[in-house]
């Protein structure tokens, strides 16, 4: 293989600057071929030029991995015998020379056609895919950690909300207990247990007890139901008692007018002992009006009183006459 033809073709494509670089590189390359021992020059450089760019760079920078790369290349069209002695070579450490060799190794890829295109497309794509996978895995792990943190924080937040709600309920219950103390009363259905309703209930119970006492005093009042009817019956009974007392007082006064019965004080004391103090004022006022009611008595009452008065006067006149006769 003539190296100058490949370099001329490459220089024709690249330009005058690339042509000069190719001429200089060809001179240096010939110098290397002439200086190297004859046992190692059998087709190894031609194989290097026919290799892809990435493999040539790896072989030039990492000579220890030449055996593994030679095995991968043997799977293609190149024979394994051409690359085996190339693994023991030592290349110069000039970076410019290595870059030029890697650049001009594209000639072999253009000559090989599909094989070089497949290798060139497959090799750079794999590292990118691996990098994408490596980048994606930490993102997934980060997302999982974030989800776990969010779930943990949400659980803590719910626990805090529950604690706050329980504390607020306790505070409300304590405030209510301070405001309204608990009343140990077993209330029936429809009955309240607050202080006002309890006071009203006690007042009604007292009134009912007094009404029962009045019903016991008034005859025939036990059979009557209803507060209004009971009160009417009590009023009628009291009025009848007043009339009876008036009649008795008038008869006593007609029989012996000298006897001064202090009926007002007697009746007031008796009524006070029998009835509640709330009726004392009314009864005393009514008793004060009883003497005046005698003037408004019916005619039959006045006639009876007149006969009684005449009888008393006749007895009084007879008594002194009898005394005179005895004398």
From Swiss-Prot:
SMART domains: HLH (SM00353). The keyword DNA-binding applies. It comes from the Eukaryota. Keywords: DNA-binding, Nucleus, Transcription, Transcription regulation. The keyword Zinc-finger does not apply. Residues 137-179 are annotated as: Disordered. GO terms for biological process: regulation of DNA-templated transcription. Expressed in leaves, stems, and flowers. It is found in: Nucleus. GO terms for cellular component: nucleus. GO terms for molecular function: DNA binding; DNA-binding transcription factor activity; protein dimerization activity. Residues 191-241 form the bHLH domain. Its main location: nucleus. InterPro entries: bHLH_dom (IPR011598), bHLH_ZIP_TF (IPR024097), HLH_DNA-bd_sf (IPR036638). Homodimer. PANTHER family: STEROL REGULATORY ELEMENT-BINDING PROTEIN, TRANSCRIPTION FACTOR BHLH48-RELATED. This is Transcription factor bHLH48. It comes from Arabidopsis thaliana. The gene is BHLH48.
């Amino acid at each position: 293989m003539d190296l100058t033809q490949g370099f001329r073709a490459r220089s024709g494509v690249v330009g005058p600057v690339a042509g000069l670089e190719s001429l200089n590189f060809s001179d240096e390359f010939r110098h290397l071929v002439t200086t190297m021992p004859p046992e190692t020059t059998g087709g190894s450089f031609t194989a290097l030029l026919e290799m892809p760019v990435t493999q040539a760079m790896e072989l030039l920078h990492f000579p220890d991995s030449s055996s593994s790369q030679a095995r991968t290349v043997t799977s293609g069209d190149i024979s394994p015998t051409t690359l085996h002695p190339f693994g023991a070579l030592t290349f110069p450490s000039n970076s410019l020379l290595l870059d030029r060799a890697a650049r001009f190794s594209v000639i072999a890829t253009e000559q090989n056609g599909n094989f070089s295109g497949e290798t060139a497309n497959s090799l750079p794509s794999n590292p990118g895919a691996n990098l994408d996978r490596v980048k994606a895995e930490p993102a997934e792990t980060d997302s999982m950690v974030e989800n776990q943190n969010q779930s943990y924080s949400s659980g803590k937040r719910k626990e805090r909300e529950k604690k706050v709600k329980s504390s607020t309920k306790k505070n409300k219950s304590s405030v209510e207990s301070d405001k309204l103390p608990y009343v140990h009363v077993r209330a029936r259905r429809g009955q309240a247990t607050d202080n006002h309703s309890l006071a009203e209930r006690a007042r009604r119970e007292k009134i009912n007890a007094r009404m029962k006492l009045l019903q016991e005093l008034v005859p025939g009042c036990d059979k009557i139901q209803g507060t209004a009817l009971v009160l009417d019956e009590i009023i009628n009974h009291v009025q009848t008692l007043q009339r009876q007392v008036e009649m008795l007082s008038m008869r006593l006064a007609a029989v012996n007018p000298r006897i001064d019965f202090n009926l007002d004080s007697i009746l007031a004391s008796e009524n006070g002992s029998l009835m509640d103090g709330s009726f004392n004022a009314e009864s005393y006022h009514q008793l004060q009006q009883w003497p005046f009611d005698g003037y408004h008595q019916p005619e039959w009452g006045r006639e009876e009183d007149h006969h009684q008065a005449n009888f008393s006067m006749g007895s009084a006149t007879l008594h002194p006459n009898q005394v005179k006769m005895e004398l």
